[in-house]
């Protein structure tokens, strides 16, 4: 069906090119090339997606300071995530980036990356809730859909490139463009709420107090509200693409209250 649509598009372009003498300078070769690229983008396969995700996370690991295996941050994360093998069949792997930004993300291949500055402000249970939220996006395939959209609107906006039948490696410029697109990507409010719910249940299954979801969001809100702080500006940029934190906090608090779960005493 997609091939038929593509052929119709090419035929339409050919007809349009010869429909008027006034269009004599219409570049038919360029138009058909653009149609080919568009068709390639639309037919991006799961295998191609996997290759691009692998290339992206490899690039990210190379362009950020990854904490060593014996680093305190790594040891803490390893202890927290011990026994977490997969997310709905997708194998998980974890690393810590030693960076100033407060963030965490998960890729479609199950690669979860936690920033050291986030670990600095979160308790173990709060951090586990955030990780659960990110894993929720992987399990629900939000990460895959978001990556595909970012890929096609940034690094592959001109179509899928290939060399000798294989995908061409993305350039540093393309990977940088992809990173920016992913940072600015927006999950729907429904996707974010479902990921929050996943994180909530994730904490319960781990034997932790699910109130930690609300508490982790509360900490992020407090940081977000700090004025004149470079960290705050980065958080404002980050959460401009997320549903309102107050609403998310309220949802998690109501969820825990309705289940009769006591709010932990904050020391």
Named regions from a protein language model:
Residues 11-16:
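Hydrophobic helical h-region of N-terminal Sec-dependent signal peptides
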Residues 38-39, 62-63, 177-184, 238:
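A short, mixed-charge helix-start or loop-turn motif at secondary-structure junctions
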Residues 19-20:
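N-terminal signal peptide c-region/cleavage motif recognized by signal peptidases
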Residues 143-173, 177:
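Post-HEXXH active-site segment of zinc metalloproteases
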Residues 26-135, 139-152, 205-206, 225-233, ...:
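Peri-catalytic and regulatory segments of divalent metal-dependent proteins
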């Amino acid at each position: 069906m997609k091939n038929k649509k593509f052929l119709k598009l090419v035929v339409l372009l050919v007809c349009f090119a010869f429909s008027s003498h006034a269009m004599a300078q219409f570049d038919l070769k360029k138009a058909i090339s653009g149609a080919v690229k568009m068709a390639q983008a639309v037919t991006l396969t799961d295998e191609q997606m996997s290759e691009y995700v692998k290339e992206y996370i490899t690039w990210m690991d190379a362009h950020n300071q990854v904490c060593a295996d014996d680093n305190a941050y790594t040891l803490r994360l390893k202890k927290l995530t011990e026994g977490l093998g997969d997310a709905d069949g997708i194998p998980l792997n974890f690393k810590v980036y030693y960076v100033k930004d407060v963030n965490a993300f998960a890729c479609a291949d199950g690669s979860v990356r936690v920033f050291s500055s986030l670990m600095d402000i979160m308790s173990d249970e709060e951090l586990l809730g955030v990780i659960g939220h990110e894993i929720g996006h992987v399990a629900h395939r939000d990460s895959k859909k978001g990556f595909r959209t970012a890929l096609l609107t940034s690094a592959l906006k001109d179509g899928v490139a290939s060399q000798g039948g294989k995908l061409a490696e993305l350039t540093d410029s393309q990977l940088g463009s992809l990173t920016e697109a992913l940072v600015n990507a927006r999950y729907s409010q429904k996707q974010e709420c479902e990921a929050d719910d996943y994180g909530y249940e994730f904490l319960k299954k781990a034997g932790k107090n699910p109130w930690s979801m609300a508490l982790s969001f509360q900490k992020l809100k407090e940081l977000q509200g700090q004025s004149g702080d470079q960290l705050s500006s980065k958080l404002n940029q980050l959460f401009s693409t997320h549903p309102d934190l107050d609403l998310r906090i309220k949802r998690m608090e109501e969820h825990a209250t309705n289940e009769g779960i006591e709010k932990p005493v904050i020391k």
